Amino acid sequence: MSLSRCLPLGQNARVIIIPARLAHAASTQAAAATDDAPNFFQKLAHRFQGVPLKGEAHAPKSMFEDCNKEWSAPEPLPAIPKDFKEHPDRDLVNYPYPARPMYPPKSRLLMMPDSWFTPFQKVTGVSGPYLFFGGLFAFLVNKELWVFEEQGHMTVGWILFYLLVTRTAGYKIDQGLYNGYQERVNFFKGLIQEDLKEAVEFKKTSAKQTESLNSIKESYPTALKESMALQLEATYRKNVQSVATELKRRIDYLKETEESKARVEREQLLKLINSEVDKEFSDRSFKDKYLQNAIQQLKGLNVQL
C-alpha cells in the first residue's frame, strides 16, 4: 500500500510513491541479520529476557530467577530418638531435649514475633496489637524515653539492605548453608563410622565365634564320648602292653632260673661221676682186674689186616 491514495491529485502536485512492501522486507532482512549476529547490548537484553541465543539448546538461567523465593529443606534435620537417655534418672517429660528448629518462628512486620500479637487478638481483635505497639512506640519517642542518636536514621537503610539481600540472595544463601550443614554432618558420620569400624568388626567376629560355640555345644557330647572312648582304648592298650611286658619278664626270669638250676645240677652230677670214676681208676685192684680182662679179650680177637 502507498500514500498516493491518501493525497488529492492536482496540477502542480507532486506525488511520491513509496513501496511499503519493499521497506518492510528491508527491515525484516535487517532484523534477521541482527538476530543472527546480535551485538553486546542485544545479547545482554536476551540474557535478561531469558531468550536463548543462536547455537544454545536451552534458555539461559536468569540471575534473578531465585528472587523472592522461599527455600524449604528437602528433608528435616535428624531428631533425637524418644527412648534415648543419657542417664536413667533423666526426666524427659518435664525436661525434654532441646530441638533445633528448621525454620524461624512466624513473625509480623518482618521482625515482630507472632506470639506477641496473638494474646491481643482475643480481646481487641486483629488490629489491636498493631495499635498497641504503634501507640507504645509513639509514646516512648514522644516522651523521649527512647531517644534516637544521630545515626538512628541509618537503621532504615540497614533494614532496606536486609530486605534486599534476603529477597534476592536469601534462597541461595539458605540452600548453600543447608548443603554445607549436610556435608559437615556426613563428615562427622564418616568419622564415627571409622571409629566404630573396629567395634563392628569385633561384633562380626563375636557373632561368628558365638555360632561356632553353639555348634560345638551341640556336638560336644558326641565328641566327648568319642574322646573318652579313645582315651579308654589307649589306656587299655597301654595296660595290656605293660602286663605283657611284665609277664614276659617274669617268664624269662623263671626260664633262666630253671636253666641255671639244671646246669648246676648237671655240673654237680658230672663232677661227682668224674670223681668217682677217677677214684675207681686210682684203685690198683680194679685196675689189675679189668686190665687183665681187657688183655685177654684182645688176644682172643682175630685181627685181620
Swiss-Prot record:
Keywords: CF(0), Hydrogen ion transport, Ion transport, Membrane, Mitochondrion, Mitochondrion inner membrane, Transit peptide, Transport. GO terms for molecular function: proton transmembrane transporter activity. SUPFAM superfamilies: ATP synthase B chain-like. It comes from the Eukaryota. Disruption phenotype: RNAi-mediated knockdown results in either embryonic lethality or arrest at the L2 to L3 larval stages. RNAi-mediated knockdown results in a delay in somatic development. RNAi-mediated knockdown does not cause sterility. Gene3D superfamilies: 1.20.5.2210. GO terms for biological process: proton motive force-driven ATP synthesis. One of its GO terms (cellular component) is mitochondrial inner membrane. It is found in: Mitochondrion; Mitochondrion inner membrane. Belongs to the eukaryotic ATPase B chain family. Mitochondrial membrane ATP synthase (F(1)F(0) ATP synthase or Complex V) produces ATP from ADP in the presence of a proton gradient across the membrane which is generated by electron transport complexes of the respiratory chain. F-type ATPases consist of two structural domains, F(1) - containing the extramembraneous catalytic core, and F(0) - containing the membrane proton channel, linked together by a central stalk and a peripheral stalk. During catalysis, ATP synthesis in the catalytic domain of F(1) is coupled via a rotary mechanism of the central stalk subunits to proton translocation. This is ATP synthase F(0) complex subunit B2, mitochondrial. The gene is asb-2.
